[in-house]
Design a protein with these regions (language model features):
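Non-catalytic, usually N-terminal nucleic-acid engagement modules in DNA/RNA processing proteins
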Residues: 1-126, 245
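Glycine-rich phosphate/ribose-binding loops and adjacent secondary-structure elements
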Residues: 104-107, 116, 120-123, 127-249
Length: 249
């Protein structure tokens, strides 16, 4: 692969273990209840505080600590071209108060990530420089999304260097996806790339592109393929169906 590579910060992977999503990051909040998504404290495998996340392995029960600095260290070791600041992922059913706390926490973590990224970069001057993207959170709230986006623009390291690009993350209401993306795009600088995290449905891609998003990532396309389904101009269909057995078009 001659093109650029990306690595995520680990925020989704850690928090999806327990802090805690029982089912999904629901894009259609009207069809789910809070207890469908948010696990009770005793059922959570991850616990968040202002410093980072402590999580329990679902494989062997061991305890691990994940912080912005740890995330930067791992992503530097992997060596992807574009890496992301460690952020706190929330759902559409978290309270407004918690969303406010989360935006503030993600902002603080973004500063720590930028500082650690600079330190690690300077410690290895012979390696190609990795680009670091800050992540906009704020769920479905316009003021929080705009606040988060503006806040990321103010963050710089000791040399006065800010983020190389921006990710738009968190749970997004499907019916309002383009609107939410548009709020963020309005506040982010035009000269830097904007990446939309966790979106891959064809109709969502077109809506997000129209709103100003540049690139995307999601596990869904490979999952769809593993389950013998494909997307086409006429929609999604399962290629194991009998009527497609001899269809090679």
């Amino acid at each position: 692969w001659p093109g650029p590579t990306f690595t995520d910060s680990g925020g989704f992977q850690v928090l999806s273990l327990g802090a805690g999503f029982r089912k999904v990051l629901a894009m259609d909040v009207d069809r789910v209840q809070a207890d469908d998504i948010i696990a009770e404290g005793k059922q959570r495998l991850a616990h968040v505080d202002d410093d980072g996340v402590t999580f329990t392995s679902h494989l062997d029960g061991s305890t691990h600590r994940f912080t912005p600095e740890v995330s930067m260290g791992i992503q530097h070791q992997i060596g992807a071209d574009i890496i992301f600041a460690f952020d706190e992922l929330t759902t559409l059913v978290n309270t407004r108060g918690y969303q406010e706390q989360s935006v503030a926490r993600t902002h603080a973590w973004a500063q720590r990530c930028l500082d650690e990224h600079r330190r690690l970069t300077e410690a290895q001057p012979d390696r190609p420089r990795q680009a670091l993207f800050g992540v906009v959170q704020g769920a479905q709230y316009e003021d929080l999304r705009r606040q988060a986006a503006r806040g990321l623009e103010t963050i710089v390291d000791a040399q006065g260097r800010g983020f190389d690009g921006y990710g738009i993350g968190g749970a997004l209401e499907k019916q309002n996806l383009a609107t939410i993306v548009g709020w963020c795009i309005d506040e982010l600088p035009e000269g830097k790339p904007r990446h939309l995290l966790g979106i891959s449905e064809p109709d969502d891609l077109f809506a997000a592109i129209a709103a100003g998003a540049d690139t995307f990532d999601c596990v869904s396309p490979s999952r769809v393929a593993r389950n013998a389904a494909v997307y086409s101009a006429s929609g999604r269909f399962n290629i194991t169906g009998a009527k497609y057995r001899r269809d090679f078009t």
